[in-house]
């Protein structure tokens, strides 16, 4: 497995900066979020990558706000050890003392088919990447989140995981994806109740124009996904700004207006 840090550039102390961590940061929504956070002043943006060695270079040219910096770390959601290893490296090599925002964004949607013929190994892969990885990420980052003034733990969800409105999408051949996203919703809501100091919630980013979004559009017979990455990022950032423990934490919200997405 590639090392989580090939070289150690000088990174300013995190003590007076806003520190963000985003998984699945090499493309799509993850890259869009990294780009938006990096444009903010006095920020440290940590990009979690499935393969740091081959993917980190593509982020080097992203523009930066005043006194802001980027750190790329190895954070493969298919790995059970990467989250803890990445946090150790962030503390030891980069002097990270807190995390203000952690976004579990990395996901997989593949091996389409109904529950009646779904091989268990396909479900296990989806559960690891879409659900277990979010839990491992929280467990690894919890102490650094607790050191922040107003920490947020955000999981990118999917409305197809709904139970109450399953009838509207029951024929979609996305059993693996939907079930694993449902598990992630439970985990984040559980984290909300167990940690009174933390704002933890799930956000539906919309049907975005990413590689995964394009696949879903084809499955549903649509020409393309309706929501641009820029629109989704802007909405998520707006929801982050207004989020608090009493009104946001523990909920599954829509990126555009913060309304509830059915469980």
UniProtKB/Swiss-Prot annotation:
Induction: The genes forming the sterigmatocystin biosynthesis cluster are co-regulated and induced on oatmeal porridge or the fungal isolates were grown either on oatmeal porridge or in YEC medium (0.2% yeast extract, 5.0% corn steep liquor). Expression is positively regulated by the cluster-specific transcription factor aflR that binds the palindromic sequence 5'-TCG(N5)CGA-3'found in the promoter. SUPFAM superfamilies: NAD(P)-binding Rossmann-fold domains. GO terms for molecular function: norsolorinic acid ketoreductase activity; oxidoreductase activity. The active site is at residues 177, 181. NADP(+) binds at residues 29, 76, 105, 177, 181, 208, 210. InterPro entries: Fungal_SecMetab_SDRs, NAD(P)-bd_dom_sf, SDR_fam. Pfam families: adh_short. GO terms for cellular component: cytoplasm. Pathway: Mycotoxin biosynthesis; sterigmatocystin biosynthesis. It catalyses: (1'S)-averantin + NADP(+) = norsolorinic acid + NADPH + H(+). Its EC number is 1.1.1.349. Keywords: NADP, Oxidoreductase, Virulence. One of its GO terms (biological process) is sterigmatocystin biosynthetic process. Belongs to the short-chain dehydrogenases/reductases (SDR) family. Short chain dehydrogenase; part of the gene cluster that mediates the biosynthesis of sterigmatocystin (ST), a polyketide-derived furanocoumarin which is part of the most toxic and carcinogenic compounds among the known mycotoxins. The first step in the biosynthesis of sterigmatocystin is the production of hexanoate by the fatty acid synthase (FAS) units stcJ and stcK. The polyketide backbone is assembled by the non-reducing polyketide synthase stcA by condensation of the starter hexanoyl-CoA and 7 malonyl-CoA extender units followed by cyclization and release of norsolorinic acid. This is Norsolorinic acid ketoreductase stcE. It comes from Emericella nidulans (strain FGSC A4 / ATCC 38163 / CBS 112.46 / NRRL 194 / M139) (Aspergillus nidulans). The gene is stcE.
